[in-house]
A protein has these predicted regions:
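Glycine/Thr-rich beta-alpha phosphate-binding loop at enzyme active sites
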Residues: 113-145, 154, 193
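Glycine-rich phosphate-binding active-site loops on the catalytic face of alpha/beta enzymes
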Residues: 72-83, 125-134, 173-194
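Glycine/small-residue-rich loop that forms an oxyanion/phosphate-binding "nest" at active or ligand-binding sites
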Residues: 40-92
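Single conserved hydrophobic/aromatic residue that forms the stacking wall/gate
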Residues: 1-8, 12
Length: 204
């Protein structure tokens, strides 16, 4: 995840990309620089998908359409959004051949909501331990297990405080997508960190 424009360096564009499948434009960049940041990344990196972490809450079809217009392959919406918003986002993403990731941050009843989102056609359901809970030592592992146990069609993503030295425990639960932010972006050697994460996910 790129959360600050200073992180969007040639290292990420040309080297880290060799070890990732999706590069995320984090919410802080979207807030500070707007969707042109998504376009910029899309224009300057090849061979990986671009995820725009908009954390949509309302006007979902419009916001998805704008992210897609600027080159996003995957767009995020909050799981606490209204069903009508999520259904509209799914429809807009799929109409354009793109994917929707539903972020479960702040969802209280994970099991029930995951089932509902699965039925609505979400491409990814992401269990997410936010920065504020990470500071309290909360891990996404239990949430990951809960969501995996109840969904039938959606893929499962996991995010929140994952680093090269903790990713093996997460990877052991076989999520479809592991989202690593600061564990790569803030590492002394981001390329080596990305390489370690990829190896852990692939079980090497």
């Amino acid at each position: 995840t790129l959360d600050r424009s200073s992180a969007a360096s040639d290292v990420y564009k040309r080297q880290v990309k060799d070890y990732v499948d999706i590069v995320e434009i984090g919410t802080p960049i979207v807030i500070n620089e707007g969707l042109p940041a998504v376009q910029h990344l899309n224009d300057n990196i090849d061979g990986v998908k671009v995820l725009a972490d908009l954390k949509i809450m309302d006007a979902a079809d419009y916001e998805v359409s704008q992210a897609v217009k600027f080159g996003a392959d995957v767009v995020t919406i909050l799981g606490v959004a209204e069903d009508a918003s999520i259904k509209a986002a799914v429809e807009e993403a799929h109409k354009n051949g793109k994917e929707l990731l539903v972020d479960m941050i702040a969802v209280q009843d994970l099991e029930t909501r995951a089932k509902e989102l699965d039925e609505m056609g979400a491409d990814y359901i992401a269990v997410h331990t936010g920065y504020d809970l990470q500071a309290q030592g909360v891990s996404p592992l239990d949430s990951l297990k809960t969501v995996k146990s109840v969904i039938k069609n959606s893929k499962v993503a996991v995010a929140g405080g994952i680093k090269p030295d903790t990713i093996e425990e997460v990877a052991a639960e076989n999520p479809d997508l592991v989202i690593v932010g600061g564990g790569i972006a803030n590492a002394d050697d981001p390329v080596e960190a990305a390489k370690q994460c990829k190896a852990a996910v692939e079980g090497k």
